[in-house]
Design a protein with these regions (language model features):
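Extracellular interdomain linker/stem segments of modular secreted and single-pass surface proteins
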Residues: 48-56, 164-171
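Surface-exposed, short loops/turns at beta-strand junctions within beta-sandwich domains
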Residues: 11, 20-27, 121-123, 134-143
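Hydrophobic loop/turn residues within beta-sheet-rich immunoglobulin-like superfamily modules
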Residues: 7, 20-22, 67, 76, ...
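A short beta-strand micro-motif common to beta-rich folds, especially ectodomain repeats
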Residues: 15, 26-38, 129, 140-153
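Edge beta-strands of extracellular beta-sandwich domains
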Residues: 40-49, 156-164
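Solvent-exposed, low-complexity, repeat-rich "mucin-like" stalks and linkers
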Residues: 1, 53-101, 173-203
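Surface-exposed binding patches on compact interaction domains or structured appendages
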Residues: 1-16, 79-128, 194-212
Length: 212
């Protein structure tokens, strides 16, 4: 991770040492030696400072189709463990069931458990969580929830998960009613997820809607 410039030289000379950006949570070290043509040697230890503990998502937003299904959310971290939690919005909240496990640096890891082999010590790793079997949205409103990812040190990343609005639907419990000569009231029960209005229509329109 260290660049030496120049790598070789003669007599008195200033040598520059620079490093690649370090994303690991722990300091890293490289040991170097310099040797003359005559066999004299000296050693140098180069330390690079640790990066701050971090967790972040690849995107602040994720989406679910109105028909439901799965949604995968990814990000990066260098923490020793990650804990996932979901909070539905107060209005039009989306209910999500978190899985027991997620993937950290390619390894299946339990939510909130210490990550095997501590990959974050050396650098940032990729994490991924898949929320499965999101039900269809039967409302005409978008539904939202917040996925919160918390690192061991308390750092957080939030992702807003939005499910597209469902289709407007309406059902009647009868196709035909027959009023008596006095016009005595009868009831048709309407089941809908939307506002609705009655209006007169042509007979052919009604028959077509009924599939006749």
């Amino acid at each position: 991770f260290v660049t030496v410039d120049p790598v070789s030289g003669s007599v008195d000379h200033a040598v520059n040492f620079s490093g690649e950006k370090h994303t690991g949570r722990l300091q890293r070290t490289i040991n170097l030696t310099v040797t003359t043509n005559g066999g004299a040697k000296k050693a140098l230890v180069v330390n690079q400072a640790a990066a701050a503990e971090v967790v972040r998502s690849d995107s602040p937003n994720a989406s679910v189709q109105k028909t439901g299904g799965n949604v995968t959310i990814t990000g990066k971290s260098n923490s020793t463990k990650l804990t996932f939690a979901v909070t539905p919005a107060e209005e039009n909240g989306l209910t999500l069931q978190l899985p027991a496990n997620y993937t950290a640096a390619g390894k299946t890891t339990a939510n909130g458990a210490v990550i095997a082999d501590d990959p974050g010590a050396a650098g940032e790793f990729v994490w991924s969580i898949t929320i499965s079997d999101v039900p269809a949205n039967v409302t005409i409103e978008e539904l939202t929830a917040t996925l919160k990812v918390t690192a061991a040190g308390g750092q957080t990343a939030n992702v807003t998960v939005t499910q597209a609005a469902g289709d407007s639907t309406i059902e009647l419990d009868k196709e035909t009613i027959n009023l008596d000569v006095n016009g005595t009231q009868q009831t048709v029960n309407v089941t809908s997820n939307d506002s609705w209005t009655w209006a007169q229509a042509a007979a052919r329109t009604v028959l077509r809607m009924m599939g006749r």
